Amino acid sequence: MLTHSTRRWLAGLGVAGAFVAASASPALAAAKEAPLELGVYFSDTTLATGSEGKIDSPLLFASGPVVVEGLTVTYDYTDLDGTVQVKRDSAGTECESPKAGVLVCTEHFEIGLDEWAFGGLFSVVMTPTAKAADGDTGVLKVTVSAEGLTPASHSAKIRIGEGVDLAAPGEESMLSATPGSKFSAPLTLSNAGETAAKGAVAVFDLDYAIRPDKQYSNCTYEDGRLLTCSFSEVTAPGETRSAAVPYVLGKDTYAPGSDYGYYNWMTPAEFEDFSTYLQAGGYSMGQPGKGSVLTLPTVPSKAAARGFQADTDPMNNWSGMTVKVTGKNGADLVAIGDKLTGKAGDVVTANVGVRNDGPAALDFGRGGSPVTKIDVAVPAGTTAVEVPEVCAPLNGDQQDWENAGKPGAKLYRCYPDIFIGVGEEQTVEIGLRIDKVIPNAEGTVTINAKCECEGFTEDLKPANDVAKILVNAAAGQGGGDGGALPITGQSTGLLAGLGALLLAAGVGGYLVAKRRRTRFVA
């Protein structure tokens, strides 16, 4: 379930998070009892005439967890009628061409698949031939197969277009603001190629704190967040266009600190390919704003023509800003315990976790780490028999993620989301079997664990970082947080598979790199 602004705009347009296979193929989610089915997705792609082409790989998944042998991907590009050549890019994959227009690649090691699509295997380079001309289009049929399973196919649209080189400033804007204050940042486009760029689309990756102060009709928004802006202006070779985009820093921004925002330029055709990819995963591109049109006027340019390219190096398509947040605006995370009753043999459910009492939200989306750790000590006389996958047995400061979700441990460490808003609760349900009735049996919920690990360390009120789990408490015994029963409300849920990243239609790799501020290698 995507609950927080389409999972923070796909966890920052690395589409990090939740392209679940069932989203692209709803039938796969219909019944867990059905036979296992393979699935494959390959992005629509636009190639520039005369260019070296593009490298991409299919997204592979299954309707349930399975380890397969003889995993094979077949690329059938006969429909492209000699305008595109498809060749192996991965040195470790064995490929052969049984006939013209067909490439068959096989992995000889066992491969694990599940509902979470992943890319990187069977990557190919798609190169326009000398025959290719602007306006050519065709279908690349991609089929996945494995021993004992029915093959699955997906047809991707391949188009040939004119080559351009969109570029953004190489340096980020350095800004400063306090929570609740307004500021503006430049949105700049240069044409560093030799062909006029007929329109462009900016795709934004903004931290939660950075919000639009004004809406425009040629931009799209979701839950108050700026997602994209489309421009129809023709940018001549060597020309630069720029606009000042107004923003406001949210009042619930953590301070002091830093927040980041990036934008990436795409041609309209590339953006259409990207949109198709996102829509296949069930993600919203937002709604047009209710304001005037944001224009990109020309400005004095220092851009120089760099030869005929089609954005083959996406690193010159992005730029952004760093906002130094000044002032003081912290957060108080509160442990949530529970109070349970039952007789011997009963299985009772402890709903435990963390609540953010503010005044600031916590956004760890850049690093991808959970906002805190939730350590759960099982009460005496009970056994944990139902444990979610986001909880792992804990031994000292070491969590055993190989046995995540395994019942029977006395101590667990659970991971909440990478973001928590003010007033938001994130809880996990643990089923406890009462083996022996012990009056006032007590367990604990501890957040902000002191460990050599990532997480929040500057809690405003450490005194409420521990709450009790009471089983068969005597009258007058407190439970939950602060002695009261927990406020359950609607949890945003805990993210399983925090490291599940996938490549996004030719832009995901470098966008993930920008979010994590490290180099991404597919």
Task: List each model region and its residues.
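Membrane-proximal extracellular "stem/stalk" segments
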Residues: P314-A484
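Low-complexity, intrinsically disordered segments enriched in Ser/Thr together with acidic residues
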Residues: H108-G135, S232-T276, Y415-T444
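Low-complexity, acidic Ser/Thr/Pro-rich repeat tracts that form intrinsically disordered stalk/linker regions
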Residues: M1, A27-G53, L60-S63, Q85-V102
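C-terminal membrane-anchoring or membrane-association module
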Residues: M1, G497-A522
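A surface/secretory-pathway sequence property marking extracellular, secreted
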Residues: A31-P35, V68-G112, G199-A236, S369-R413
